[in-house]
């Protein structure tokens, strides 16, 4: 687990699980899992990673920011595509190692860089992946 320079560590298990402060438990690479969910439809749009700076920017700006492992850099979702994700609610799980971000996608409403509304556009059927929008 990596210690954040932005968010304080949990004082104890009760503070972590029941406290009012956000104290994310970043992994050894300084990342926490993030799921983006459409605020109106409930559809899961994407999975990404956040470092402490991405999480702070998301909380401060109300626009989803992530951390790209392949580019090793911050990534403001939709900055170039126009598909910004406006945050309506951010939830953190019981042990604070994953976040659920409810968003309203802007632009054409897409979230996937391949062009689909959701990154989860393939279904396993009869031994193969089949493309299918939700």
UniProtKB/Swiss-Prot annotation:
Gene3D superfamilies (alphabetical): Phosphoribosyl-AMP cyclohydrolase (3.10.20.810)
UniProt EC number: 3.5.4.19
Enzyme class: hydrolase
Cofactor note: Binds 1 Mg(2+) ion per subunit.
Chief subcellular location: cytoplasm
Record: residues binding Mg(2+): 93, 95, 97
Catalytic reaction list: 1-(5-phospho-beta-D-ribosyl)-5'-AMP + H2O = 1-(5-phospho-beta-D-ribosyl)-5-[(5-phospho-beta-D-ribosylamino)methylideneamino]imidazole-4-carboxamide
Alphabetical keyword list: Amino-acid biosynthesis, Cytoplasm, Histidine biosynthesis, Hydrolase, Magnesium, Metal-binding, Zinc
GO CC annotations, alphabetized: cytoplasm
InterPro entries: PRA-CH (IPR026660), PRib_AMP_CycHydrolase_dom (IPR002496), PRib_AMP_CycHydrolase_sf (IPR038019)
Residues annotated to bind Zn(2+): 94, 112, 119
GO molecular function: magnesium ion binding; phosphoribosyl-AMP cyclohydrolase activity; zinc ion binding
Keyword Magnesium: yes
Stored PANTHER family: HISTIDINE BIOSYNTHESIS BIFUNCTIONAL PROTEIN, HISTIDINE BIOSYNTHESIS BIFUNCTIONAL PROTEIN HIS7
Family: Belongs to the PRA-CH family.
Protein name stated in the entry: Phosphoribosyl-AMP cyclohydrolase
Organism: Caulobacter sp. (strain K31)
Taxonomic lineage of the native organism: Bacteria, Pseudomonadati, Pseudomonadota, Alphaproteobacteria, Caulobacterales
């Amino acid at each position: 687990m990596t210690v954040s320079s932005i968010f304080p560590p949990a004082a104890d298990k009760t503070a972590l699980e029941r406290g009012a402060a956000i104290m994310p438990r970043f992994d050894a690479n300084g990342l926490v899992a993030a799921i983006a969910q459409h605020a109106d439809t409930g559809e899961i749009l994407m999975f990404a990673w956040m470092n402490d700076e991405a999480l702070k920017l998301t909380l401060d700006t109300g626009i989803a920011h992530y951390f790209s492992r392949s580019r090793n850099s911050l990534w403001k979702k939709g900055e170039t595509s126009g598909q910004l994700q406006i945050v309506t609610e951010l939830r953190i799980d019981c042990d604070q190692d994953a976040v659920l971000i409810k968003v309203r996608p802007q632009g054409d409403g897409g979230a996937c860089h391949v062009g689909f509304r959701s990154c989860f556009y393939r279904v396993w059927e009869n031994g193969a992946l089949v493309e299918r929008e939700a």
